[in-house]
Design a protein with these regions (language model features):
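Eukaryotic scaffold repeat domains enriched in small/polar residues
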Residues: 22-335
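Bacterial N-terminal signal peptides that target proteins for export
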Residues: 2-12
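Bacterial N-terminal signal peptides
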Residues: 10-20
């Protein structure tokens, strides 16, 4: 009887292990290879890709380019916010602004965030400077309706600060998360990038959070859907990240963490969200349920470590500095 019981336990253990391995293996649904590179020759210094309501594309490459504007057929039209012909620095790079993020509003005005100068500059479609807002430690920028602009910061008491048309603060929301007893660690781990949708909602993607998370907010700042990567295949990386937090907790040196969530984008039609974790691409429905997981590659078969992601109805535009921006067929729209 004991022998039969032992065999049964062993059989069940093997069955459970097989099921577990099957679940983990099933998480990677496919390997996606880009169809082609777009917006050539931009690549080095790539920071952001945006699609305006006017049909134009806006590609931020820094520090030497500025915001390059392309038409619907991906032909370059002009450059906005290009650095002035300044004296190169000792490293041989052009002087001038260092754009880290950008966005475009319904009127075609472009907002460029400069982390070095602590400025968010609004530029007209012809490149004329309309206004500049001084922001302490800006990280990401998003244009909102009615002339408002949202900025995420590294040093603020809230995650998001919204400025009105006059440049004054009109509201703040989002509380930094508690990961550590050290305030500087909590601030860094709460750092995030911004995105929007046509309904005026704002999305906050935590760059360094152990469990990758993009949180949806309405325009007033009330939290909505959480798009969070959890599960068996997310556990090892999250566990390693939390161990690193504990390790740095006891150090007296400035904290440093490797980015986990590197890009995200929202489907303007459905509200579904796509999230990039370096070479891994995750797809969520509008309710925050994870649908699929992919590995992404260039047409030449090189790993694509995404730092920009733009979702369109029939394709994904995914970019990496310095490789450039690539066109992917949407796997959920394959016929």
């Amino acid at each position: 009887m004991r022998r039969n019981t032992g065999k049964l336990v062993a059989f069940l253990a093997v069955l459970c292990l097989a099921g577990l391995l099957g679940v983990v293996a099933a998480q990677i649904d496919d390997q996606l290879t880009a169809r082609r590179r777009v917006f050539k020759p931009l690549g080095p210094g790539l920071r952001a890709v945006r699609h305006g309501q006017n049909g134009k594309y806006y590609v931020l490459a820094t520090p030497s380019v500025g915001v390059a504007v392309f038409d619907e057929k991906e032909k370059q039209l002009t450059v906005i916010g290009a650095p002035a012909a300044a004296v190169p620095d000792k490293a041989g790079r052009p002087g001038g602004a260092f754009g880290e993020d950008c966005d475009v509003d319904a009127q075609g005005n472009v907002y460029v965030l400069d982390r070095v100068e602590n400025l968010v500059s609004e530029l007209a479609p012809d490149g004329k400077l309309l206004r500049s807002i001084h922001v302490n430690g800006p990280v990401s920028v998003a244009a909102l309706p009615e002339g408002e602009v949202a900025v995420s910061t590294l040093r603020g008491s809230h995650l998001v600060t919204v400025y009105g048309p006059t440049g004054k603060v009109v509201r703040e929301f989002g509380e930094p998360e508690e990961f550590s007893s050290r305030q500087e660690i909590n601030q860094l781990l709460s750092e995030g990038r911004l995105g929007t949708d046509p309904q005026g909602r704002l999305y906050y993607g935590y760059t360094f959070r152990p469990e990758p998370l993009v949180r949806q907010y309405d325009r007033a700042g009330y939290a909505g859907v959480d798009f969070e990567f959890t599960g068996l295949d997310a556990f090892p990386e999250a566990q390693a990240a939390r161990k690193e937090i504990i390790k740095q907790e006891n150090k007296r040196t400035p904290p440093y963490f490797v980015a986990i969530l590197t890009a995200f984008g929202v489907d303007p039609a459905t509200g579904e969200l796509w999230m990039a974790l370096h070479n891994t691409l995750l797809h969520f429905d509008k309710e925050g349920n994870r649908l699929s997981e992919y590995q992404i590659y260039t047409p030449d078969g090189a790993r694509l470590e995404a730092n920009t992601l733009l979702v369109e109805p029939e394709r994904l535009l995914i970019g990496e500095d310095p490789l450039g921006v690539f066109d992917f067929e949407r796997p959920d729209k394959k016929h």
